Amino acid sequence: MVRAMTAPGSNIAAGALAPAKSSAWRTELIETLWLAWPMALTQLGQIAMMTTDLALIGRLGDAAVAAAALAHFVLFSTFTMGLGLVSAVTPLAAQAFGARAPRQVRASLRVGLWAGVIAGVPLTLGQLYGEELLVALGQNPATSRLAGDYLDGLAWSLVPGWLFIALRGLMGAVNRPEPALWIMLTAIPINLGLAYVLIHGSFGLPRLEIFGAGLATSIVSWAMCIAAAVVCVTMRPFRKYQVFGELFRFDGELMRRLLQLGLPISGASVLEYGVFGAAALLMGKFGTTALAAHQIALQVAAIMFMVPMGISVAATVRVGHAVGRGDPPSARRAGFAAIGLGFVFMAAMTLLVALTRHQIPQLFLGDSDTSIETATLTAALLIVGASFFIADGLQVVANGALRGRNDTKVPLLFAVLGFWVIGFPFCWVLGFHTDLGPFGVWIGLAVGLVVYAALLVWRFHRLTRDAMAAAVAA
């Protein structure tokens, strides 16, 4: 069902002067949940696609799994660089939707698509030299060669992946995120079947092994991108925006706004990805058991993290709508409703993980003596990670709320402070200069994330409080 837009500027003064009623908060929570659930399931679908790929690659042997890990490191490092550019479509389009400006909704998508293509073409070509890069970084030449084969197929998923995110952002911005979920759910079994056929060679096709897995992902990524484009052109809720109208018209001012929003998002994502990569390197110094336990515990965190990611995008949309129509009280309410939802979900998941910490590692491990040792350490890390999980959920939702207000530069500075000025030094000191060992690394990550999350929530509180005061004064 398509929601009607609220008239811009309605009841602003009344809303600013009076406290939010319980019915307004209840409505906001319902609206946020309605937006968030398909977005969260779409994020989980991406994890499912990666998991099925790794399961199929695992049948090729340990060397292939190691190569896939290296290839994913190269690809995701690059993917994160451009992620902010296409993610900026969501707040720009949401604000235009709230302001009842359909031409600006279309223009927001247009600049996002162009940014994805312009950044994606050279970065895709760079992926084709993944083997040389990994060898230069000191990785095993044989494993690097296999990783290069995988990247030769996988690299072509970069551009369609970004374009799909931009199109998905438009869908969410106009309150219709469901088509992106249906596309993702359809893509998962198709990717599984195509990857199996191309890896092992069936139906008369050659056996391509690890290259086939990467190629399947790229083919499915392009299919998802095309499907999203078709949906945006043909489905009634999107037709009025004529999303590909004036596709080749360059809007320098809007591109500047997208870069101002998107580059700091990319920067913060790179800083976050980097600190977790650095933590993995530190864990590797404690041996393979510690590194394996770290990876399993992080995989659990990554799965839980997808739901706050969906809530975060919903926060961007809801706050963006309120900003677009000039309604500071609703913007504040939307952000804190989303932050509350993120906290409740992650607190519940943290409790569940704590209660099942001994069973979770068995889903990833066998019954050997080494596996038992890894499982024991993983269970201990999951207990240490209790504050880590909650803070991680809070920071991503608060970030989403701030993006709805076009606030991304100061959060980038907070990321520098939280991850690298505080978090990583704590990881190093507690891990290697105390008796905590691997637990010290995780405590350091938790400290950095708690600081980062607290700063983001505080900033959203301050900005929205000041905006409401300004509305009253006006």
From Swiss-Prot:
Multidrug efflux pump. It is found in: Cell inner membrane. This is Probable multidrug resistance protein NorM. CDD domains: MATE_NorM_like. The chain crosses the membrane at residues 33-50, 65-87, 108-130, 150-172, 179-201, 211-233, 258-280, 295-317, 334-356, 376-398, 410-432, 436-458. It is a multi-pass membrane protein. GO terms for cellular component: plasma membrane. It comes from the Bacteria. The keyword Metal-binding does not apply. Keywords: Antiport, Cell inner membrane, Cell membrane, Ion transport, Membrane, Transmembrane, Transmembrane helix, Transport. Signal peptide: none annotated. Coiled coil: none annotated. Pfam families: MatE. It comes from Rhodopseudomonas palustris (strain ATCC BAA-98 / CGA009). Disulfide bonds: none annotated. Belongs to the multi antimicrobial extrusion (MATE) (TC 2.A.66.1) family. One of its GO terms (molecular function) is antiporter activity. Its main location: membrane. GO terms for biological process: monoatomic ion transport.
